[in-house]
Amino acid sequence: MAVIGGVALYFMTRTKWTPPAAAQPYLPDIMAAEYQNGMPRYLLARLLYQESRYRQDIITGKTTSSAGAVGIAQIVPKWHPDVNPLNVSESIYYAAKYLTKLKNQFGDWETALAAYNWGMGNVNNAMKSNGYKWLASAPTETQNYVSDIWGDVA
């Protein structure tokens, strides 16, 4: 009985992720983009936190990733030339639409998150090679990316 009570207590006291104060200026666009794309609440907010931590140096492009990713959604202009990654509102809506496209392609949000982080081609190749155990063959960074975001949202 103690174990069951402990499990119940865990779920009763577990707190879901909530956006940090730095996210507040962007929440109207984030919430609208999530709603328009049928996303779980705070999925996009959590993705953007994972990508930029809502740090101004990243959002403004002063700091870029080693892969050339820029802005709040860490968009690589070479792969996504139709969006201005330094336009915050445009990037938020683009990231939501792109993640939803990935979800529709792969069938679930977890795989969509992996594809956002690691790339569609890499996820497709891993699925072909490893079947349903594909995530175990993904880089640790991608495994952590998915669990950090989805674990806080689901």
Q: What does each model-found stretch correspond to?
A:
Residues 1-17:
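Single-pass alpha-helical membrane anchors
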Residues 15-154:
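Catalytic glycan-binding domains that act on GlcNAc-containing polysaccharides
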